């Protein structure tokens, strides 16, 4: 795991070391020393540690302030010179001066601040980078702030207690400080955490812990430091600069507890493999060179299509659509010339990765790498091919969108038609099984409603009756075929009825004459069902008069005589 992913939070550590739950006047010495190791090994930036301590000093709880002052004093004595520079800055000293000037502050906290400022001023005496603490003490004394009397213990405090060893600052150079090999993008530089020198991968590939720097995890060291540390010597070897090499001022070193990072080696291997593939890769022949193969494939496809059509014609199953489908199914789909090969995709991805890595390199590094320029030229030649591929993809996308819209419309129309058919079938099913009621077709003039017939249909093999009614003297005509109708019970003779005028003569059976006689309507039956004529009602009698006795039944005849009124 890399060092930046395992960095502990300094704020959490400081907050835990200065917790309100700690008894007054006591501190967790083990946790304080652990924080000192984090600062001294540069695992956490010194400025972040200083700001975290300052936030705890500004807390309103006096116990938290006293614990923060105690932790600050321990870190000053064990944190290293880079941490002392941050402590001696105005950002940290000004809050301490504000507490010393405030008469309303907690007396114990104020007295402790004055005591520590006086001790630190004595310890930092004679160092320009730490002069701000001494100036603060002088200014407070000039303002009339009384400091506690210095004891003999404070007089014994010298600058030796701040000489705690810390990882050295890194030295920058253009060549390896051991082999003299110049650095490049492929031959990267590596710093030794013990001496701060810069070396190549071959000269700085050992890992070991550095307890004298507070580094308890394996870190990268050069070969010389590794041998000395194995022998029990913590002093860094002296590396003489290579003649002709240019060195710069020491650079700010990153945290020293970085674990082995194999990403650089993997990138170098990937670059070498990609370049080897690029050298051995042969571009495909141009499209003109493959035209013959395409012609052969097309001829074979056409011949196969013709054979299929001939076979279908012989079997009687040929059709235009079938022939089109057969020819389409036998067509060989040639690979698109605009598709990128695996090597081309690998080169594009590798160039993108290298460009991202070059952002953290010094200016001009890319100009000193001819292989990267060669890779860039190779990828640049793919731009027209990528443009054509993108154009074809966009066209295909548009056509697919159009087809999708058409298909959606067709499906919607089909669903509507299917729903209509289903509704129609459901309606027919609901009305099915019930035969339509027969209707009676009749013609009448001046007939009362109660004389309307209730029989409809056509009687096959049954007698047929026909009636006619005119405005003149009505008469009844009837012809009975087969079975005599129910009107055949009337006596044979001439019956004369008139709507106006004198009443007709009484029948020979006797009885009062009928006053009003309705003319028989004209009926026309078609498809009437069979009925039992024996139970059929007799013809209605004239209103107002007694009903005449029925005549004896007449024998069945082949044809009934015509009755005239």
From Swiss-Prot:
UniProt-listed InterPro entries: ENTH_VHS, HGS/VPS27, UIM_dom, VHS_dom, Vps27_GAT-like, Znf_FYVE, Znf_FYVE-rel, Znf_FYVE_PHD
Coiled-coil regions listed in the entry: none
Origin: domain of life: Eukaryota
Any one cellular-component term (Gene Ontology): vacuolar membrane
Comp. bias intervals (Polar residues): 1-10, 478-505, 516-525
The family this protein is said to belong to: Belongs to the VPS27 family.
Subunit details: Component of the ESCRT-0 complex composed of HSE1 and VPS27.
PANTHER family per UniProt: VACUOLAR PROTEIN SORTING-ASSOCIATED PROTEIN 27
Listed name of the protein: Vacuolar protein sorting-associated protein 27
Higher taxonomy: Eukaryota, Fungi, Dikarya, Ascomycota, Saccharomycotina
Gene name of the encoded protein: VPS27
